[in-house]
């Protein structure tokens, strides 16, 4: 880990929503495949739930209705319950929306807010529980490959492994 603590960047980013309608087909398939893990994580992974119901609205102006309908059609492959709502219903769900701007919206009641800290902590416990170690303040200064192994040089030591993952 380059930073002084694990998760310095990853736990503070805005990827804290579970949205089966987000991204391209590959991302959506990966998201759908991970649903069971978040709904029912392995025993001991976390003492608290990994997600909570949140729901999301995606709004559209009148000139964007066609695009919104296309998005709803595509989204229903993964989230059959996604709803297209009119502007009045969108404003009922979120009263701060302007009536002169919002003509329609999608409402995804299946969207969930992820507990990033619980997820990150669960993975860290899993790593260390299996004998793994997290080394911090270890920015890679050189990376070489020799005889099927990678060698990473850092200010705190040299590490060798058959696989390197750039998780930045």
Model features per residue range: what roles?
Residues 106-163, 167:
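Helical element adjacent to the flavin cofactor pocket in flavoenzyme catalytic cores
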Residues 15-93:
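Dinucleotide-binding Rossmann-like beta1-alpha1 core, especially the glycine-rich loop
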Residues 1-11:
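Glycine-rich FAD pyrophosphate-binding loop
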Residues 73, 101-102:
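Acidic/polar active-site rim loop that often engages polyanionic ligands
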Residues 3-5, 90, 123:
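Short beta-to-alpha linker loops that shape the active-site pocket of alpha/beta-hydrolase fold enzymes
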